[in-house]
Amino acid sequence: MSKAMNPHPAWVLATCTAVTFLYSMSLTAVNVSLPQIQGALSATPDQIAWVVTSNLVATAVMTPLTGWLAARLGARRLCFACVGTFAAASAASGLAGSIETLVFWRAVQGAAGAPLVPLSQAIVLASYPRERHGAVISIFGVGAVLGPVVGPVLGGALAEAYDWRAVFYMMVPFAVAALAACWMFIRDRETSQPIRLDWTGFLMLSAALAGLQLMLDRGERAGWFSSVEIVAWAALAALGLYLFIVHTLTSARPFLDPHLLRERNFALGLVLIFVFGMLNFTPMTILPPMLEGIAGYPDSVIGWVLGARGLGTMVGFGLMIYASRFDPRWMIGLGFLLQALAGWELSQLDPGFGVHDVFWPMALQGLGVGLLWVPITMVAFSRLEGERLAEGTAVYHMLRNIGSSVHISLSTVLVVHMTQMSHGELSPNVSRYNESLSLPWVRGPLDLGDQQSLAAIQAEVARQASMIGYLDSFWAFSATALVVLPLILLVRWKR
């Protein structure tokens, strides 16, 4: 194709920014409607987490394939196929009649969306000269930052005005517009050589991830290792990981070059980005059921609360314009401390909390996210170049998504387990034979001889037990952010 026929780079930048906005919006918009979905599809708390984790696992698995797919199909066709499949999966998610069907289409949506951000970034960088990359990436990043702000607010308003299906349907027109832009403004570029993919290692790692995620998602419901099913998933995860490690150490060109891990900063960067992933989306998944179930807030209010996180992230990314002036180790430490502080503040809530009690911790958590992303990336790739940089990028983003899916599952398990344990401890005290409940300042207007009064007390016990489960999950969130801090001291950095 001649140079005259190539679209203006500004149109390419606008298209790639829109595609990134679409994907980032989808990551947060759905979380607002999780309580509605749970009720409409008769899902349990652990099942509703699958709506999020299935998307993240599919994204983690498909992200490393981006380079290979782009070399095979071309950037234009890959972008068109991904956005088209994303649109179809979004529509199918809105039509889902069961939790299993919804989880399947969310996985398809995640798999289709996985290549969009790295592919769009590569297209933008290839469309502009190197001296303009800094300014261009800043504009491109607007899509990634704006999506998490707009997604929850718009999704919450639509879910309240209509129902949860509208949240998925709203993505379709955005996707169709992005689809048309991809076809008009994205052009293929010649690649120097075909990219070889280690399919054996990829399939082994995928099997290990699938086994691990299914074990975590199904464990609490099935009774953990007393269940043959959970033992089977654990065996699949262990066997897949073992075979992947053996294959990686013996293959001439493995899926993950083990020599990358000899680079100290990159290895530490992988641990840091894994923990970053653990902290990134967990509050977005845990909070909506708590806000609806404990406080009874509508979807629109939940959307604004989650949108606070996006605002905090925007501020954090804005501050990172000056990142080159600071030692990234200090910024990483500050980012994780802000995450820990946000988790601690959420763990201090009581059942009578107000919107402002949750709004500001979420904004603080978002600020921590914004402060962490750039310095962790700077540290991880400070000593990688060329082909090693491309390979390291794939592993880097994959581990971030795995961290998110694993921690969401663990947090959900903790909420369910501690709720059941707390309910078991509190419930036996609700009895007409409990003399403490007969005291006037305890009993209030309730008549312990009336079944309706006892039922009301039991409902409050269930509410209190559920609150304990959520508070414990936020304690764990805060502890996770603090545990990683000593690793920052091992990072080597020179200006």
Give the residues covered by each predicted segment:
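Alpha-helical transmembrane segments
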Residues: 14, 84, 205-209
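MFS-fold secondary transporters
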Residues: 89-94, 109, 182, 276, ...
